[in-house]
Amino acid sequence: VIDIATYPTYQVFLGIVLAVVACVALFPLWIKMLRYRNIGQQVRADGPQGHLIKQGTPTMGGVLIILVVTAIYVLMGNFGRLSLLALAAVIACGALGFLDDWSKVARERSLGLTPRIKIAGQGAIALLFGLLAVNWGHVSSEVLIPMTGVSLDLGVYTSIFQLGSYAIVVPWLYLGLVFLMMISTTNTVNLSDGLDGLAAGTITIVMLAYAGIAFRQDHLDIALLAAAAAGACVGFLWYNSHPADIFMGDTGSLGLGAGLAALAIITKTELLFVLIGGIYVIQGLSVILQVASYKLTGKRIFKMAPIHHHFEMLGWSETKVMVRFWVVTGILAGAGFALYFVGTVRG
């Protein structure tokens, strides 16, 4: 008799299904509780005028998403140091996002924690994650260049500090890359959370790509974590689709953004993430180019940044922007996964 429950593919699929079912079942109660406590979204006055109707929509859906992901990960019972580190990054940045969300709700304004406080918090989490990944998770400081079989050694400038009986290895260049990846990804995912279903949909696609990569690497624990996150986002989308009944808030976008960065680091696809998570690169670049152009020339490149608002201002419906961004995400993530797969086969 074949015990299908022991099959890794079955376990990954089960993780997705359980996360979807849990979120679909629990979010109505979560939404009801948020409405009862008047915990609603504060909308920017300088954003698209059509978004003003979203004022007061329940937010902080990311709390339940992260709780479900954690519960499914524990329930599946397949633990590993790297997946635990990735989950810790999700929870830590999710907690920072929660403070930001709560600050907005308490003050009844669209601005929560100051950018300086958020960057400091993200930076501290990134540095701690990097140190633990190298010293506890044994993540290499080498960065693989896709399709070449060549790697860059970012551990050439390394310090070793003695802490009691422990030697703490600090590869400065690699730690800088981790810092940059964690901060840029959390914030660009946060930028993408500006339309109903946009962030959750793109995160789902990229998480599925990383579930496949981790599975290919025989890291079942990491694959299960990514699969659970993808499933939770799908369940959340049931209520976040336009017109949204709930938003994930910074709790979700910062937490899941950190999770994506962590997955790229622990699967050693740091450079390939530029393609797999290319939609977030596009979103971030649109803001950088907009600000730089305005400061240098006094003119704006886009009607509004990030770029998804530009298309809204061109007359695209919110749903059309969302679906087309999903398509672009799928193409980029699929291309990145294909490059990874071909590279490992050749290797």
Model-derived features: positions:
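Juxtamembrane helix-capping/reentrant segments at transmembrane boundaries
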Residues: 44-57, 108-122, 308, 313
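Alpha-helical transmembrane segments
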Residues: 2-35, 65-102, 129-149, 171-347
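Short, Lys/Arg-rich N-terminal segment immediately upstream of the first membrane anchor
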Residues: 2-8, 54-55, 109-112, 163-166, ...
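A cross-family signal for N-terminal binding/gating loops and helix N-caps
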Residues: 35-41, 48, 52, 64
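Carboxylate/His-rich catalytic cores and anion/metal-binding grooves
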Residues: 117-134
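Membrane interface segments of multi-pass transport proteins and intramembrane proteases
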Residues: 104-114, 145-154, 163, 317
